[in-house]
Amino acid sequence: MKKKTIFQCVILFFSILNIHVGMAGPEQVSMHIYGNVVDQGCDVATKSALQNIHIGDFNISDFQAANTVSTAADLNIDITGCAAGITGADVLFSGEADTLAPTLLKLTDTGGSGGMATGIAVQILDAQSQQEIPLNQVQPLTPLKAGDNTLKYQLRYKSTKAGATGGNATAVLYFDLVYQ
């Protein structure tokens, strides 16, 4: 009787083993591999990455009519180490648009001190042509050469309505390049 029980246990063990071996056939696992191989672009010079630009201090009486502008301050962006294959880049200045003039950059309380000027926004200009660069709109190809480049722009205040009021006139502007 003892031999019969051992025999039955051995048969049961091999039966279970056979079931697991039969079920453990090859499994196929699907993996998706992705990434990019891109040409070397350019680097933004450290001194250009975080800039504090003082446009100036102006009397509010200079902004009593709509579309009045201040003198401009330079905004230079140094681009270094551009690869030989880079011929240019599309440029995008982005930020919060002014509600009355959406092509202009809205003043924002960057320091939390309040007392914001009203009826005034920041206008971005191409330094060479003096043409406005609309905020949040990609500008077509800006030529770049291999090596180092300086992109030259200007910023100025522009009144968006008659009767602007004085105060804090700070704003935050972002800059992006899409290489060609």
Swiss-Prot record:
Domain of life of the native organism: Bacteria
GO BP of this protein: cell adhesion involved in single-species biofilm formation
A Pfam family of this chain: Fimbrial
Record's GO cellular component terms: pilus
Gene3D superfamilies: Fimbrial-type adhesion domain
Signal peptide: 1-24
Keywords: Signal
Entry's induction text: Expression is negatively regulated by H-NS and subjected to cAMP receptor protein (CRP)-mediated catabolite repression.
Extra remark: The operon is cryptic under classical laboratory conditions, but is functional when constitutively expressed.
Biological role: Part of the elfADCG-ycbUVF fimbrial operon, which promotes adhesion of bacteria to different abiotic surfaces.
Protein name stated in the entry: Uncharacterized fimbrial-like protein YcbU
Taxonomic source organism: Escherichia coli (strain K12)
Name of the coding gene: ycbU
